[in-house]
């Protein structure tokens, strides 16, 4: 029940924030709403072709803040933070995997495939329902709905 309420709240926030991002040519990567020691925080992670600057974050923060004040979906005070997802961003959607084709990722699954729950390899192929990793000289195809967490591996 609690999870259902959170998902409805998350959906409502996304319905407010995503059109604003799209209007100004940004991609809404993720939303995070949580209680921290200094109070409630709404984090909005954005991206765009060429990357996100501090000025982009400030600009979009102002636009989002105005709309949230009008729609008022959060019944108490909170801090709004708008930022880039960073190099270690989670991959959540098909287009996230497509954008990082050929790059190395760590994927943790909800349930085992081939006796394993964790895989590390390069993104080889992405289709509507799965991602295929190249691991050394072999390949493993993972259904997107079975992915618990997927993160880019940043190599320097």
Swiss-Prot record:
Keywords associated with the record: Cytoplasm, Ribosome biogenesis
Keyword DNA damage: no
Keyword match Cytoplasm: yes
GO BP field: ribosomal small subunit assembly; translation
Superkingdom field: Bacteria
Compartment(s) where it occurs, according to its Swiss-Prot or TrEMBL record: Cytoplasm
InterPro entries: Ribosome_maturation_RimP, RimP_C, RimP_C_sf, RimP_N, RimP_N_sf
Primary location group: cytoplasm
CDD domains associated with the record: YlxS_C
GO cellular component terms, semicolon-separated: cytosol
Function noted in UniProt: Required for maturation of 30S ribosomal subunits.
Family: Belongs to the RimP family.
Name of the protein this chain belongs to: Ribosome maturation factor RimP
Organism: Dictyoglomus thermophilum (strain ATCC 35947 / DSM 3960 / H-6-12)
């Amino acid at each position: 029940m609690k999870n259902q309420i959170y998902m409805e709240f998350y959906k409502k926030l996304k319905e407010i924030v995503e059109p604003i991002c799209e209007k100004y040519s940004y991609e809404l990567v993720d939303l995070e709403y949580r209680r921290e020691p200094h109070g409630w925080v709404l984090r909005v992670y954005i991206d765009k072709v060429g990357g996100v600057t501090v000025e982009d974050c400030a600009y979009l923060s102002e636009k989002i803040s105005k709309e949230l004040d009008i729609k008022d979906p959060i019944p108490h005070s909170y801090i709004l933070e708008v930022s880039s997802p960073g190099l270690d961003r989670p991959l959540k959607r098909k287009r996230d995997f497509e954008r990082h084709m050929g790059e190395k990722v760590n994927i943790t699954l909800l349930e085992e495939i081939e006796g394993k729950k964790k895989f590390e390899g390069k993104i080889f192929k992405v289709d509507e329902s799965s991602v295929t990793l190249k691991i050394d000289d072999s390949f493993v195809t993972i259904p997107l709905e079975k992915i618990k967490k997927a993160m880019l591996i940043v190599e320097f």
